[in-house]
Amino acid sequence: MHPHDQTIFALSSGRPPSAIAIVRLSGVGAGPALQTLTGKLPPPRLATRALLRDDRGDPIDDAVVLWFPGPASATGEDVAELHVHGSRAVITTLVSLLSAMPQMRAADRGEFTRRAFENGKIDLTEAEGLDDLIHADTDRQRRQALRQLKGLLGDKARSWRDQIIQAAALIEAGIDFADEGDVPAELIAPALAWIRQLLAEIEEVLAAQGRAERLRDGLTVVIAGPPNAGKSTLMNQLARREVAIVSPHAGTTRDLIEVALDLDGYPVTVIDTAGIRQTDDPVEQEGVRRARDRAAQADLVLWLTEDDQAELERQTDGPIWFVRNKIDLMITEQSGAISVSPESPVFAISARSGAGMSDLLEALVGFARDYFGATEHGLITRERQRTWLSETAAALRRSIAAVDLGEELAAEELRIAALALGRLLGRVDVEDLLDVIFREFCIGK
């Protein structure tokens, strides 16, 4: 971990060339750097046009600069932004000048956000929400990440923690009274009622069955089947572009091909696999092995043709939909859903002409809707969050059971519950975890 007496900088926009590039700075050297480049500090929080100059006084670029004195800034430190033209030459010159300034260095991944966290601008759940927002592929993922970034889980966790501490204070006050006789019931009874109410609220959040986590991770659909069944053609139809090579020769697909889709706002990853068959070709054998492995891990398998159904069913516990392809070559075949069995529906399509695809797509959207559920009520988006909420709930249960054994035990369990929520928020004993979380961010964020 780098010391905070160093000022960090990074290109926060996309790769050049581009219309505009944004270079961010954070730390005690942000103001002096801005002064060196522009000749003076601009008014705080006001976009100001300025000519940037190098150390010889030669112009670099005509820019828009912003100055945010800390602590009223995104990171809690002095922050500057340089909005320049996004040419490689401008950015290279600017980065070279900044690198040569004293106590100035390039930022690590997620370091701006980490400084915001360490300066109390955001908690860890909000930082995770920001990471999810950056990586959101669909509108539903965006809305969920934004709820997290706005502190939906963090605010609840802080409220729960404060109430647990107050309940513990009531019990500990009762312990103090016990030195003079029995523990007053008027202290213990409301504390217990408070704890039970908190436990019910946390258990309700935990009972959401990981819906928000599912939305963050997405749904995986594997297209499997024998060689030359039209799997790659179906993949291209679903993606509405050519992502897989289509050939009349069997065994064209040797490796897994993945494409991310947005189905009515739901994130779906579709995977095209090698044709499953017996073969002596070692390369194709590896492709078949990977196909079987991915089918076993999939949330849904689309099996083209009905050959080897039993063999596939033994390899996956998940749902299988059978898709009869190439109906354009079968005069009497009817397109669309030809079986409505909820366990293994059968669809008749032509991946080449698109016949029957609307029914298959409609069914996929319905499957995704059921799979993700009512995600707008989900608060937990990561296993880490679920772990600490589960620890909190377990400690609250133990505190209720411990009251009859001794108020000291109940108070200790409440301290454990408050500690777990502190870890959820990133305020207690999480130093080792921070490197892992912020490493997922991009440079400049």
From Swiss-Prot:
Give the residues the record marks as binding (6S)-5-formyl-5,6,7,8-tetrahydrofolate.
Answer: 24, 81, 121, 445
Q: Which GO terms describe its molecular function?
A: GTP binding; GTPase activity; metal ion binding
Q: Which cofactor does it need?
A: K(+)
Q: Can you tell me which residues bind Mg(2+)?
A: 232, 253
- Cell location: Cytoplasm
| Cofactor-binding details, from the entry | Binds 1 potassium ion per subunit.
Q: Does the keyword Cell membrane apply?
A: no
From the record, give the cysteines joined by S-S bonds: none
**Keywords, A to Z?**
Cytoplasm, GTP-binding, Hydrolase, Magnesium, Metal-binding, Nucleotide-binding, Potassium, tRNA processing
- Known NCBIfam families for this protein? mnmE_trmE_thdF, PRK05291.1-3, small_GTP
Q: Which PANTHER family match?
A: TRNA MODIFICATION GTPASE GTPBP3 (PTHR42714), TRNA MODIFICATION GTPASE GTPBP3, MITOCHONDRIAL (PTHR42714:SF2)
Q: Which family does this protein fall into?
A: Belongs to the TRAFAC class TrmE-Era-EngA-EngB-Septin-like GTPase superfamily. TrmE GTPase family.
Complex formation: Homodimer. Heterotetramer of two MnmE and two MnmG subunits.
Task: Specify the protein name.
Answer: tRNA modification GTPase MnmE
Species per Swiss-Prot/TrEMBL record: Bradyrhizobium sp. (strain BTAi1 / ATCC BAA-1182)
